[in-house]
Each structure stands twice: as structure tokens, then as C-alpha cells.
Amino acid sequence: MSASRLERRIREAQAAGRPALIPFLTAGFPTKERFWDELEALDAAGADIIEVGVPFSDPVADGPVVAAASQRALESGVTLRWIMDGLAARKGRLRAGLVLMGYLNPFMQYGFERFVSDAADAGVAGCIIPDLPLDEDADLRALLAARDMDLIALVGPNTGEGRMREYAAVASGYVYVVSVMGTTGVRDGLPVEVADTLARARQCFSIPVALGFGISRPAQLEGLSHPPDAVIFGSALLRHLDAGGDAASFMKAWAER
């Protein structure tokens, strides 16, 4: 099977001798108007892939920063339809691969077939749905694959090798390695088990390995003898924007590492 659009973006970064950069930005944050400016700024500043968060009222896996951003977006009227329309209006203008990340409920309410069709028309390259079990994702995965889109797998410290290999049999794009059990959020350092989780993922998956949850600055990767193929950062970026910063200045620290 040939590499998907998302896998190719990460492989291109690897060929340049660096990990791919994958910022996460909640749709409609910090405001509906400014979101689109910051999305385009992330793209211009060198993001390889951008994960666009779909707001949901019960974000059980999100820490306080992402949960607050989601709530603000919902209060301002952000919907999956609004996200689709905005991305479609910018199709062809963004260099980065686009991934929609959110909980199952908004996608189910939208309708899987309609979602996949509209996402493809908007230039989306994949999606991440943390609460969609592997045993129940075959229909959506097939719909996405037919339009050259990936359903990204998530694994963590408690994911056994057997389960990883089950994911690996159907996974595409990249695998999202969760650095720590619990919710998203900024942390001072990475837990010692991260190296082991990354090593197990590399043994099981042939696609790139991306590390997320608790990543806030490049220095956190320095202690890893085998760094991930891609790094995902969200809470630190959202906090930076909420404090009045801009996406370009945040990305600069990562692009120049």
C-alpha cells in the first residue's frame, strides 16, 4: 500500500533530518475570526500537519486548557459544519496536512458518509477520534480510505504489544503515541516510560510514530535516545495564544530547534 498524504509529510520532514511538527489548535479559538488567521500562521511557520480540534461539551480526555478552549468555541457557535465550510474556503491555500480531531458524538451526528464526503471536499487528510474503539471503526475507516484519508490510531503506555499489532494491521498515516496516561496538558518533563512506549510502537508499526500529550518545548525531547518521527503539541500553544501570543512566534522555537 502506498504512503498516504500524512505519512508522506512526515517522511519529508525525516528526510530533512528533523521530526515533523504537528500543532493542535481548537477550532474557533481564541476567537472564531482569529482562529483562521492562526491556522494560516501555523501553516506559514512550518507546520507539517495541523490537528484541528472539534469542540465537544464533554471532553473527557482533555486537560483544563483544551477543555476551556473547547467550551469557549462552543459558546461562540463553532460547529463541525462551520469548520468544514471554513476549511473548504481555504482548500489549496494550506501546505500542511489537515487532521480533524474530536470525540465521536459530533461525527456521528453529522453522519459518517456525509462527513467523509465533506471532509474530502475541504482538503482534510485524516481524523482522530479517541473514543471510537478499534473493534467498531471498520466502517468509518473504509469510507476514509476510499477518499485517501487516514483514521489515526492512538496508543499509550498501557497498550500491550498484541493490541498495538491489531492497530498496526489497519493503521495508516501515523500512529499517535500518548506520552502519559490521563488527560492532555502541559508538563515539565516526560515520564520515564515514554522511551519504552515509543520503542514498542516502532516494533509494531511501519508507519511514522508521533508523540503527543504534555509536549510543550523542544528540550523535552533531548533525553530520548530515539526521538519520535513527529511531535504533537497543543495545550502549550493554546495557552500561548490565550495570553496574547501568536502562532508564528510559538512555532519559531520548534522550527529552529
From Swiss-Prot:
Catalytic activities: (1S,2R)-1-C-(indol-3-yl)glycerol 3-phosphate + L-serine = D-glyceraldehyde 3-phosphate + L-tryptophan + H2O
Enzyme Commission designation: 4.2.1.20
UniProt cross-references to PROSITE patterns, sorted A to Z: TRP_SYNTHASE_ALPHA
Active-site residues, as the UniProt record annotates them: 51, 62
Catalytic EC class: lyase
Cellular component, GO annotation: cytosol
One GO MF term: tryptophan synthase activity
Keywords: Amino-acid biosynthesis, Aromatic amino acid biosynthesis, Lyase, Tryptophan biosynthesis
Pfam families given in the database record: Trp_syntA
Pathway: Amino-acid biosynthesis; L-tryptophan biosynthesis; L-tryptophan from chorismate: step 5/5
InterPro entries: Aldolase_TIM, RibuloseP-bd_barrel, Trp_synthase_alpha_AS, Trp_synthase_suA
Biological role: The alpha subunit is responsible for the aldol cleavage of indoleglycerol phosphate to indole and glyceraldehyde 3-phosphate.
Family per record: Belongs to the TrpA family.
Complex formation: Tetramer of two alpha and two beta chains.
Name of the protein described by the UniProt record: Tryptophan synthase alpha chain
The organism of origin for this protein: Nitratidesulfovibrio vulgaris (strain ATCC 29579 / DSM 644 / CCUG 34227 / NCIMB 8303 / VKM B-1760 / Hildenborough)
